[in-house]
A protein has these predicted regions:
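Residues in the short beta-alpha loop(s) of Rossmann-like NAD(P)-binding domains
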Residues: 15, 38-40, 156, 333, ...
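Walker A (P-loop) phosphate-binding motif
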Residues: 108-158
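C-terminal helical cap/extension that packs against the catalytic core
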Residues: 44-45, 504-559, 598-602
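Short internal beta-strands
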Residues: 30-38, 328-331, 491-494, 513-522
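Short beta-strand "acidic-cap" motif of Rossmann-like dinucleotide-binding folds
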Residues: 31-36, 151-152, 275, 358, ...
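Short, basic phosphate-binding NTP loop
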Residues: 2-125, 162, 445, 453-455, ...
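Acidic, Mg2+-coordinating active-site environments of NTP-dependent enzymes
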Residues: 47-48, 67-76, 80-101, 107, ...
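Nucleotide phosphate-binding/pyrophosphate-handling subdomain across enzymes
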Residues: 2-3, 8, 21-28, 404-514
Length: 602
């Protein structure tokens, strides 16, 4: 990247993203300073080992990191709260410096590859409070199943810039090999062409020699032919001659056929599609990032301690669409649909609507949109198509739709109506990248889901146990309850560190779908207060093992036991993975006692 060469760059924060930015900038010739409020962040030894020329400073983030220095660009790590970096960011803004984060550098990297090699991949970007890892992983799988080369990165890991660096390094070797193969093929073609020319020349020389050897025979044959031919008028003789000359001239005229644009070897070996999972933290500093298609799956309360307000949180999410991306919108979420800008109105012209596709749990009402249809007791994933694209409609005439049934929702391995909607989002994104439908539908059937996201664990005594330990906020748990509760009753485990959330949105789905709720952790009393009026059994448990035992007693045949705490885990566990491990171990004890295998879940 030419714009980084010799540029003095300041990177705020030395986490995984900060380290990736430092590597990237140093590799492209920047003079890099990394600042962190910690004296010895865990990534410091790696930074010092890999980027020996990078300067590290510790201490508070103050304007002095920028003012009076040669710094000309400031990139901040996504985990740093706005108020923490504000003094530096404000000083950088006042000085007119280049600002952004890892996403900005990723976008600049793609622009550089486009200008140097003509590389223009499809970039599919995904965010949302819940479901983004599932949709990101599934979209990547669908793109690959459709035969396109793809890289998946971002919040899902690994980092954007590390993945781009690895792809570029791999592509350089692949491009050299491809160029060598093409040179060898061209040389072989040239040799074959030369051989054919030589053979033709030899054949012509032989024919000329044969002709010189028998001049008398040729003259006699011509004389005989002249005697048998009737004389014709001069005008008649001239006409064919003129036609022949004209034909020769026309044949000799060059045909102006434009040669197809040939991409460079680098552009042909780099990934055709990028699928990126992006958090609100990353999107808060996404200046210069322009995907080709993007989605916000949903917006529910989360990370308000970081963003401050729901509006700031939603605004950060909306940055994902950039200025030109196809917007893939969830019809079921009013906050998401509110991100669609008003049509641009030009005098005497039809209003111009931003390009968008919608998906949702209801029937689609617009060509190109995706939805769910229930018919004759079966639920289908469907897409709306225009019934007759060739027929012109009157202004006041409603558009006639053809509903294309794609596959039964029961054919999905991932459970719940919310996951059927996630599948529709992935289909819409992958379709926008030019992926064919048939192989994608096979890919949907193959996808088994992500760990700890409504993941089936076992069936014990006709009760199915699900691990949704990744459900660390109220919105995730609401989605899980609505998804699983469509065809069964649920005994749910709730509780942990609520991060100051409002638990009242749980009230309606718990009342509708839950047989009993078992409460654990620091915020169990707050959850009990929010659910007191729902008419459902509420039972406290001292720990997760006791909660699983209680659920086994409360559940009835055909029910589901769901660990979906709606809370963070750090009050009782190392992380949500540790919480899931304890849950699975407790379910394994139940399975052992019942004499069944943990592989009993579908």
């Amino acid at each position: 990247m030419q714009q980084l060469r010799d540029l003095h760059v300041l990177i705020l924060g030395l986490g995984a993203s900060g380290l990736a930015m430092a590597r990237w900038c140093a590799r492209h010739g920047a003079v890099v300073t990394v600042a962190d409020t910690r004296e010895a962040p865990p990534q410091l030894p790696t930074l010092q080992a890999e980027c020996s020329g990078v300067r590290f400073v510790s201490g508070a983030f103050t304007a002095s990191l920028v003012e009076g220095t040669p710094i000309r660009a400031v990139f901040r790590s996504p985990g740093l709260a706005p108020d923490v970096v504000a003094p530096v960011v404000d000083a950088a803004r006042a000085a007119g410096l280049w600002q952004g984060g890892e996403l900005s550098l990723f976008g600049a990297g793609l622009q550089d590859l486009q200008s140097r090699f003509g590389y223009s991949p499809q970039v599919l970007a995904i965010t949302g409070t819940n479901g983004k890892t599932t949709v990101t992983s599934l979209t990547g799988q669908l793109v690959a199943r459709a035969g396109k080369t793809v890289k998946v990165a971002g919040n899902i890991g690994p980092t954007l810039l590390d993945t781009l660096s690895d792809a570029m390094a791999q592509a350089e070797g692949d491009a050299q090999a491809l160029e060598q193969q093409e040179r060898e093929a061209e040389e072989a073609q040239a040799a074959e062409a030369a051989r054919l020319v030589e053979e033709a020349a030899q054949a012509e020389a032989a024919a000329q020699a044969a002709a010189k050897a028998k001049p008398e025979e040729q003259a006699q044959a011509v004389a005989q032919e002249s005697e048998t031919t009737e004389p014709q008028h001069a005008e008649a003789n001239e006409a064919p001659s003129e036609v022949a000359v004209a034909a020769e001239e026309e044949e000799a005229a060059p045909l102006l056929v434009q040669a197809p644009v040939r991409l460079s070897a680098m552009a042909r070996v780099l990934p055709q599609v990028w699928v990126l999972e992006l958090s609100s933290f990353q999107l808060d500093s996404s200046e210069g990032f322009e995907p080709t298609a993007a989605t916000v799956l949903n917006v529910t309360q989360d990370h308000l301690d970081w963003h401050g307000t729901m509006k700031a949180y939603a605004d950060a999410k909306a940055h994902i669409f950039g200025q030109k991306a196809l917007m893939v919108l969830n019809r079921d979420d009013a906050a998401v649909m509110g991100m669609l800008p008003e049509p641009i109105r030009v005098k005497l012209q039809k209003p111009v609507v931003r390009a968008h596709v919608t998906f949702g749990g209801d029937m689609p009402q617009r060509p190109g949109d995706y939805g769910i249809e229930a018919v004759n007791g079966m639920t289908w994933l469907v897409r709306a198509l225009e019934a007759d694209e060739t027929r012109k409609r009157r202004k006041d005439e409603e558009q006639e739709l053809h509903i294309q049934r794609l596959m039964p929702a029961d054919a999905l391995r991932i459970r719940g109506r919310h996951n059927a909607v996630n599948a529709l989002a992935a289909l819409a994104l992958a379709s926008s990248a030019g992926c064919q439908l048939a192989p994608m539908l096979y890919g949907l059937r193959e996808y088994r889901g992500e760990p700890h996201r409504v993941e089936p664990v076992a069936i014990v005594n006709e009760v199915e146990y699900f691990d949704d330990s990744k459900g660390t906020n109220v919105g995730a748990t609401v989605a899980a309850l609505l998804g699983l509760g469509a065809d069964r009753r649920i005994v749910v485990i709730l509780g942990g560190d609520g991060k100051g959330q409002d638990f009242s949105p749980l009230l309606a789905p718990v009342a509708q779908h839950v047989r009993a709720a078992v409460l654990i952790g620091r915020d169990a009393p707050r959850i009990r207060d929010s659910l007191q009026s729902c008419g459902v059994t509420l039972q406290d448990a001292a720990d997760l093992q006791a909660a699983v035992q209680a659920c086994a007693q409360l559940a009835q045949a055909g029910d589901a036991v769901l660990l979906s705490p709606a809370c963070a885990s750090l009050d009782m566990f190392r992380n949500y993975e540790h919480r899931a491990e304890v849950f699975r171990d407790a379910v394994a004890e139940l399975a052992d006692a019942a004499g069944v295998s943990m592989e009993g879940a579908l």
